[in-house]
Amino acid sequence: MKVNITNLYGMSGQSTALIAQNDVTKLAKQLGFNELSFYFYDIYSDSQSELSRRLDGIMASVGYGDVVIYQSPTWNGREFDQAFISKLKILQAKLITFIHDVPPLMFPSNYYLMPEYIDMYNQSDAVIVPSEQMRDKLLAEGLTVNKILIQRMWDHPYDLPLHQPQFAPKLYFAGSVERFPHLINWSYATPLEIFSPEEESNPEANVSYCGWVSRPELLLELSKGGLGLVWGVEDNPADEPEYYGLNISHKSATYLAAGIPVIVPSYLSNAELIRERGLGFVVDSLEEASRIVENLTVEEYQDMVERVRKFSFLLKEGYFSKKVLIDAVMEVLS
């Protein structure tokens, strides 16, 4: 018997979906899991028989009764995913669906597909969901799987020496302003440094642009000191789509892995974890975020940095992913 895990290739190297699956697979392979590689492509170029042969090749190493962790979605469409699951059922594999994203919730125009996704999830022996909020949402939508595990936090594995963060009264934001346009005109007293190509903004905006940088470069720059800002696509939390409160933020893991505290909105699914562990601040507005940084003392900052330092080790070594993967395997084999 083997434990297998699916992985994704063929997307842009900047794709968060690809990076997340690659990271989880890297950590799973440290546990001895076998990789099943998917390529992102136009599945409609395949006939049904061609798709079947493609999946047979991908699954050639899967044995009868194996455990398979399916990182969902493959982004090749539900037809591809369902065909893969159907073949696993023939092999009587134990199926663990590791839900990274739920497209019908992520894209409201695709909500009509929700019953089909729930049906796919219900074929699992266990599911891993990002948060308690996502679990409750999927149960309300018809999820019937008994064994549900909570991920809670993304890991951010890396292997390079970082700086020791020093107090700096500024905020970082790692994300394209095309997706977060309300940050272009940031006018609060606390300076905001955005890792994104420069955009035209109000001359009075207190914003500077750092351009796009690689993951190692980003960690190195963040680790010099400051605080990491996590925020949604809307300025006002009341206007934020529901989905951002169901999934878990990659940004928060990046900042914490770099060793700096975070400021997150109260609707973030793991905001309570950040509050309880003293890893930063939970706020209800960007104005409050700026005010907190303005009033932060060097001593308060260094106390937080020390707590973040210990927590960042968990993210660097991949303990959140490893734990939930091991727990899931234990569940389906018990």
UniProtKB/Swiss-Prot annotation:
InterPro entries in UniProt: Gtf3
Enzyme class: transferase
Entry's EC annotation: 2.4.1.-
Disruption phenotype: Alters carbohydrate composition of cell wall protein GspB, about 20% reduction in platelet binding by whole cells.
NCBIfam families named in the record: PRK09814.1-1
Record remark on domains: Dimerizes via the C-terminus; dimerization is required for tetramer formation. Binds protein substrate via an exposed loop in the N-terminus.
Name of the protein this chain belongs to: Glucosyltransferase 3
Native source organism of the sequence: Streptococcus gordonii
Source lineage: Bacteria, Bacillati, Bacillota, Bacilli, Lactobacillales
